[in-house]
UniProtKB/Swiss-Prot annotation:
Belongs to the universal ribosomal protein uS15 family. InterPro entries: Ribosomal_uS15, Ribosomal_uS15_bac-type, uS15_NS1_RNA-bd_sf. It comes from Acholeplasma laidlawii (strain PG-8A). Coiled coil: none annotated. Pfam families: Ribosomal_S15. This is Small ribosomal subunit protein uS15. Transmembrane segments: none annotated. The keyword Kinase does not apply.
Length: 89
């Protein structure tokens, strides 16, 4: 369920703006997107897991806020991230 060190490291390396960048909105959104996708798969088989469903909604809200911030700060980076992650915005 949780991200492994290797998968998180791969995501950070792919979306980092510079070496050692773990806090930029792009990296945070990419990690949240991966976690959201994993939770969606979990909830497909465990429909009545309401605790995980609440966690999913919280992660979606956090990602929405980060995307809103990125869109306001730099629209080009926002558009590139949306295209790369395959989000439908």
């Amino acid at each position: 369920m949780a991200l492994t060190k290797d998968s998180k490291k791969a995501i950070v390396e792919k979306f980092a703006r510079f070496a050692g960048d773990t806090g930029s909105p792009e990296v945070q959104v990419a990690i949240l997107t991966h976690e959201i996708n994993e939770l969606n798969e979990h909830l497909q088989t465990h429909i009545h897991d309401f605790h995980s469903k609440r966690g999913l909604f919280m992660k979606i809200g956090r990602r929405r806020n980060l995307l809103k911030y990125l869109r306001e700060q730099d629209a080009q980076r926002y558009a590139a991230l949306i295209n790369e992650l395959g989000l439908r915005r």
